C-alpha cells in the first residue's frame, strides 16, 4: 500500500480529521495533509510523532509497496497515444499529458500508447517546476528560471478555480489565482482560505488590468453601454476570474444572464482576444496585454492582483525556492513592468494565508 493511502486509512479508521491527528501528534495540519498526499517526505521527527499518535511503528506507517518510486499520471490522458512530460512534485514523480501552453511547444519527456510508456533517455523531471494558471506572460518568468537555475517550467493553462484543486492534490508546485473582491487585495487570500484552508502562501507576481477586449469596429466606449448593447460576446469558463468579471458586467438588474449572451467560450485571455480579432465575437473579458497584442481596443473594468499560491510544505523545495528568487529579481520585474497593464511594484512580496 502506498504511503498516502496507509496514513490516511489509519487516520480515518479512528474517525480523526487531519486537524485531530495534527493536534495529537504535534505536527501541523498542513504537514499532515502534505505527507498523506505524498507531497512531502516526513522527517524522522515527524514520522515518529505521527506513528506514536496512531499507535504504529514508523515502518508500519510508512512502508511503501509495489515500486513506490514509479511515476504515475497526474490526470488521465484524453487520447490513447501521445506525448508526456514528467516532473517531481514533492515526493511524487508525475506524468502530465502534453497540452497546449502559453509557452508554445515544450520538449516532452516521452511518448505513450495505451498503457505502454516510452521515456526519453535524458529526462528533466528533477529540474521541472509545474505551474497551473492563466498569466499570458508566464514565458518571461520561465526564461529567467531557465537562464539562472536551469529549470524547465510546465505551465498548465487553468482558471483560478481549476488550478487550486490541482495544488491541493499535490499535482503542481504553484497555482495562479486572481479573484477580485470589493474589499480590494483580500480576494486571492479569501478564495485560497475558503477553498484550501491554511498552510499556503501567496507570492505576488503583478497587479494587472482586466477589462473588455473590443473589436475596433464597435463604437461603444463605456462598459455600461456595452452591457446594454446587443453585441456578440465570447465567454470564459465558470470558475475563472475573467468569467466573474463578465458576470458582474452583464448581470445587472433587468438584464439577461451573462451565460445567455455568448455562444463561444475561450479557455484563456489570449483565446478571448483571438476570438474577437478573428470575428467570432465583438467583445470579451481579458487582460490588457492580450487585447493590445491582438490589435484590439480595451476598456478597463478593474485591477486585480495575480498571485502564485504555493503550499507551505513545498516552500523549502529547490524549484519553489528558485521561483521566489526569480520573482524578487530585478530582471523579471523589469520585463513584466514593460508590459501593458502590469503593475510590478509589489512583485515578489509574500503573504501567509491564515
Predicted feature locations:
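Short beta-strand-to-loop elements that line the ligand-binding cleft
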Residues: 152-159, 257-269
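N-terminal hydrophobic or amphipathic helices and topogenic motifs
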Residues: 2-3, 8-12, 16-20, 27-162, ...
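Short loop->beta-strand "edge-of-pocket" segments that line small-molecule binding or catalytic clefts
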Residues: 124-134, 224-244
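Ligand-binding cleft/hinge of the Venus flytrap
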Residues: 140-149, 224, 236-264
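Short helices/loops that flank or line small-molecule/ion binding pockets
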Residues: 161-175, 179-180, 265-280
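Flexible hinge/capping segments at coil-to-helix
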Residues: 205, 214-233
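A ligand-binding cleft/hinge motif common to bilobed small-molecule-binding domains
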Residues: 176-193, 273-302
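Periplasmic-binding protein-like
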Residues: 199-211, 296-325, 342-351
Amino acid at each position: 500500500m502506498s504511503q498516502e493511502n496507509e496514513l490516511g486509512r489509519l487516520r480515518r479508521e479512528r474517525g480523526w480529521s487531519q486537524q485531530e491527528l495534527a493536534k495529537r501528534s504535534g505536527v501541523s495540519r498542513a504537514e499532515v495533509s502534505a505527507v498523506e498526499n505524498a507531497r512531502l517526505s516526513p522527517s524522522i521527527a515527524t514520522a515518529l510523532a505521527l506513528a506514536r499518535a496512531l499507535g504504529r511503528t514508523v515502518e508500519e506507517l510508512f512502508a511503501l509497496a509495489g515500486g513506490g518510486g514509479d511515476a504515475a499520471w497526474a490526470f488521465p490522458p484524453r487520447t490513447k497515444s501521445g506525448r508526456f512530460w514528467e516532473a517531481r512534485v514533492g515526493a511524487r514523480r508525475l506524468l502530465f499529458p502534453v497540452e497546449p501552453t502559453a509557452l508554445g511547444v515544450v520538449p516532452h519527456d516521452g511518448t505513450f500508447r495505451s498503457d505502454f510508456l516510452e521515456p526519453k533517455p535524458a529526462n528533466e523531471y528533477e529540474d521541472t517546476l509545474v505551474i497551473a494558471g492563466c498569466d499570458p506572460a508566464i514565458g518571461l518568468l520561465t526564461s529567467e528560471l531557465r537562464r539562472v537555475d536551469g529549470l524547465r517550467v510546465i505551465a498548465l493553462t487553468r482558471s483560478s478555480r481549476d488550478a487550486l484543486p490541482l495544488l491541493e492534490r499535490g499535482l503542481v508546485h504553484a497555482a495562479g489565482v486572481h479573484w477580485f473582491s470589493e474589499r480590494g487585495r483580500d480576494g486571492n487570500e479569501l478564495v485560497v482560505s475558503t477553498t484550501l484552508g491554511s498552510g499556503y502562501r501567496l507570492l505576488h507576481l503583478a497587479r494587472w488590468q482586466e477589462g473588455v477586449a473590443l473589436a475596433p469596429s464597435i463604437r461603444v466606449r463605456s462598459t455600461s453601454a456595452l452591457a446594454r448593447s446587443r453585441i456578440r460576446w465570447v465567454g470564459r469558463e465558470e470558475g475563472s476570474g475573467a468569467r466573474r468579471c463578465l458576470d458582474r458586467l452583464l448581470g445587472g438588474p433587468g438584464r439577461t444572464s451573462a451565460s445567455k449572451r455568448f455562444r463561444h467560450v475561450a479557455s484563456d485571455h489570449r483565446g478571448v482576444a483571438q476570438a474577437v480579432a478573428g470575428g467570432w465575437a465583438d467583445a470579451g473579458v481579458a487582460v490588457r496585454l492580450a487585447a493590445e497584442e491582438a490589435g484590439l481596443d480595451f476598456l478597463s473594468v478593474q485591477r486585480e492582483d495575480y498571485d502564485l499560491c504555493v503550499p507551505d510544505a513545498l516552500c523549502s523545495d529547490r524549484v519553489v525556492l528558485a521561483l521566489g528568487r526569480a520573482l524578487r529579481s530585478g530582471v523579471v520585474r523589469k520585463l513584466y513592468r514593460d508590459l501593458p497593464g502590469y503593475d510590478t511594484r509589489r512583485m515578489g512580496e509574500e503573504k501567509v494565508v491564515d
